[in-house]
Amino acid sequence: MNESIFPHWNSDQAITFLKEWNFSLGVILLLITIILQFGYTSRSMFVYLIKMIILWLMWPLTIILTIFNCFYALNNVFLGLSILFTIISIVIWILYFVNSIRLFIRTGSWWSFNPETNNLMCIDMKGKMYVRPVIEDYHTLTATVIRGHLYIQGVKLGTGYTLADLPVYVTVAKVQVLCTYKRAFLDKLDVNSGFAVFVKSKVGNYRLPSSKSSGMDTALLRA
């Protein structure tokens, strides 16, 4: 490799670099930490999307660094470890795409490429399909309507809905299966507010029913 492109640093140069860029690196790491710590769909969809971009970039950056280490290994032991880490990183990156594509085929939603989870909650509200990521494999899901605002597991989906608009079934799509949740309880608090509880009732290997004519996946990334 060209030494002018990849110069050899000594310890003094590395310390000088850290002194000059310490503040900037600290601010960048602080921002990334805050985004990763507080980026949830129930808080801010914009921050959550930034978090997803950061997580998505982690693997390709890791692959680049491990390949770089293969060319600049300190000895044969580090070379062997660098090659091993490179292979592992590439294999995991490929598996991520394979699983994401399989989930996309099942749901038709771009949320399938979410690097944080392979669980996608799907709810049909008056012919409009909402798809959102859920982190855990819940046994129950809670839908709440507050003055026309619809929330599922604390995540706001849309407005202009009533308890009567809630479907009987909600699904959670995974790479291998599609879990069906049946409405088991509904409580009306007042005219425009209430909640419903959906309980997991069936698990099977089938696709989410398509409703493209009703705009199934045209606004899946909206808060």
From Swiss-Prot:
It is found in: Virion membrane; Host Golgi apparatus membrane. The keyword Membrane applies. The chain crosses the membrane at residues 21-41, 52-72, 81-101. GO terms for cellular component: host cell Golgi membrane; membrane; viral envelope; virion membrane. Keywords: Glycoprotein, Host Golgi apparatus, Host membrane, Host-virus interaction, Membrane, Transmembrane, Transmembrane helix, Viral envelope protein, Viral immunoevasion, Viral matrix protein, Virion. GO terms for molecular function: structural constituent of virion. Disulfide bonds: none annotated. InterPro entries: M_CoV (IPR002574), M_HCoV-like (IPR044362). It comes from the Viruses. The keyword Aminoacyl-tRNA synthetase does not apply. CDD domains: HCoV-like_M. Coiled coil: none annotated. Residues 1-20, 73-80 are virion surface. Homomultimer. Interacts with envelope E protein in the budding compartment of the host cell, which is located between endoplasmic reticulum and the Golgi complex. Forms a complex with HE and S proteins. Interacts with nucleocapsid N protein. This interaction probably participates in RNA packaging into the virus. Belongs to the betacoronaviruses M protein family. Isolate N5 belongs to genotype C. Genotype C probably arose from recombination between genotypes A and B. This is Membrane protein. It comes from Human coronavirus HKU1 (isolate N5) (HCoV-HKU1).
